[in-house]
Every structure is written in C-alpha cells, then in structure tokens.
Amino acid sequence: MRNATFFIVFYVFISLVLSNVQDVTAQKNKCMRSEMFPTGPCGNNGEETCKKDFKNIYRTPIQCKCLDKYDFARLCDCRFC
C-alpha cells in the first residue's frame, strides 16, 4: 500500500512540474516576435526603426534587434515582456 501511495504522489508531482514547464515555454514564445520588414535596411538607428514598425502593427516592444537580411529588407527580433 505504501508503494502505491508513493507512486501516485510522485506521478501527481511530476505532472505538475511538467505542466509548469510547458506554461513557461508558451509564455516565452509570446514574449519574442520576429518579422521581416521590406522597407529597407537597418541603417544607423535600426532598433528604433524596428520599434516603430512593430508599434504600427502590434504594440511597442521593450527591446529590439535589427538585422540586415538584404539591401531591401531587414529582420526585426523584438521582445515584448
């Protein structure tokens, strides 16, 4: 009887831990967003340009990183939380 109780408690504990890890991973995915903008390269002020572009579509990000992909486009990686 002791072994069965221990097994059930252990199973419930592991289930709770795994569900919490999945929630944290899902929340992290919502915090980061990447998008390609075809309005030219990053230039000298790429971070602010990315923030303005994301603000027009979603909301204002906390931090952005601008990467030149081509002469005519840039990739913006932004963090929202």
From Swiss-Prot:
<feature type="signal peptide">
    <location>
        <begin position="1"/>
        <end position="26"/>
    </location>
</feature>
<comment type="similarity">
    <text>Belongs to the DEFL family.</text>
</comment>
<protein>
    <recommendedName>
        <fullName>Defensin-like protein b</fullName>
    </recommendedName>
</protein>
<keyword id="KW-1015">Disulfide bond</keyword>
<dbReference type="GO" id="GO:0060320">
    <property type="term" value="P:rejection of self pollen"/>
</dbReference>
<keyword id="KW-0713">Self-incompatibility</keyword>
<dbReference type="GO" id="GO:0007165">
    <property type="term" value="P:signal transduction"/>
</dbReference>
<dbReference type="Pfam" id="PF06876">
    <property type="entry name" value="SCRL"/>
</dbReference>
<keyword id="KW-0732">Signal</keyword>
<dbReference type="InterPro" id="IPR010682">
    <property type="entry name" value="SCRL"/>
</dbReference>
<keyword id="KW-0964">Secreted</keyword>
<feature type="disulfide bond">
    <location>
        <begin position="42"/>
        <end position="66"/>
    </location>
</feature>
<feature type="disulfide bond">
    <location>
        <begin position="64"/>
        <end position="78"/>
    </location>
</feature>
<dbReference type="InterPro" id="IPR036574">
    <property type="entry name" value="Scorpion_toxin-like_sf"/>
</dbReference>
<feature type="disulfide bond">
    <location>
        <begin position="31"/>
        <end position="81"/>
    </location>
</feature>
<dbReference type="GO" id="GO:0005576">
    <property type="term" value="C:extracellular region"/>
</dbReference>
<feature type="disulfide bond">
    <location>
        <begin position="50"/>
        <end position="76"/>
    </location>
</feature>
<comment type="function">
    <text>Involved in self-incompatibility.</text>
</comment>
